[in-house]
């Protein structure tokens, strides 16, 4: 089953909330303050994990461990979280590290772990939807490789799995029934495993999330001040303002109250790379730009809008920006290009550093989304295609004219294959 179909399977029910005695009113005990208390305690915990040698990847993934650790309790039982964990052979007090958070329909991927391991990072990749591998080297996320149950060596009395991705459908239910509550907790504890390993630099650990993993990452950042960097890919905050189907999930009163990542951005201080596409049917570009602007005060923060980038784990892995960005923060690498001044509705002239090429992308009407299939409420896609035009760049100064028919535009600059972008500008003329 391909990535998009898995997304549909996971989230279709989200547009039709379950009506029951608990979903009508947000329970008094489920408040933002309660989340603050729970996650603050979680950050302080010592987290133990157990290796499961039978499921350690081999072949090209040799050296990556399969581990389990406790998640939050669910329905009166303890839970287990599966993860892949790896350390460079020479790991030590200066080794950078990263938590990798998969997207909807995906799982922990040894392929993704290896990519960052080869770049010199210690890595943990938890499965944040409660799935466990059925065979060694599970990573392709096909239906027959993963199970949402504790079987074989994973089975243990008194333990169960955390809820599957519910598309925010249970945001009005008891906290322990909400998938996002468990997913954020799994990321916090994954971070702690790296931090407490004694094999990494405590101040060089970051978090990278793809799609729903980016949503989790955006929320997580408001509860944990330890990350040195973060890279949400596709997903972001401000999803109640989305033009895609995501709006239907995050505009619900209970979801907005508990899970609006932007409500806690005043707590976030680490540099963030918001990496996204200008043609994503799942996450609309306005939400990414709002997220960037809300966190641009954090030194090193960047927005990267990749034109025509498709939505998948594999497409995200192909981009150089995440590792280049991380290296620039924790490894002394060259910084990505930076907008020193931004374009406006009056003029697209702006200044940048470290860029070798500049391009203008614009549309001739306001950005909107529509269904491509009336029978599928998750089939949203943007109605407009961005028009590309070259811009002059000389000594970091970008010049050019705003096309007379441009209604919205942004500028992207590149260097060594990496893209950095301005947020969208609305042409008010």
Label every PLM stretch briefly.
Residues 82, 93-103:
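Short beta-strand element of the alpha/beta-hydrolase
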Residues 353-429:
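C-terminal beta-sandwich/jelly-roll accessory domains of carbohydrate-active enzymes
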Residues 182, 188-253:
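Primarily recognizes the serine-hydrolase "nucleophile elbow" in alpha/beta-hydrolase
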Residues 317, 324-362, 387-395, 401:
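Surface beta-strand/loop "capping" patches
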Residues 114-184, 236-248:
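Cap/lid segment of the alpha/beta-hydrolase catalytic domain
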Residues 241-295:
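The feature captures the conserved acid-bearing segment of alpha/beta-hydrolase catalytic domains
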Residues 42-92:
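N-terminal cap/lid segment of alpha/beta-hydrolase-fold proteins
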Residues 295-313:
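Catalytic histidine neighborhood in serine/cysteine hydrolases
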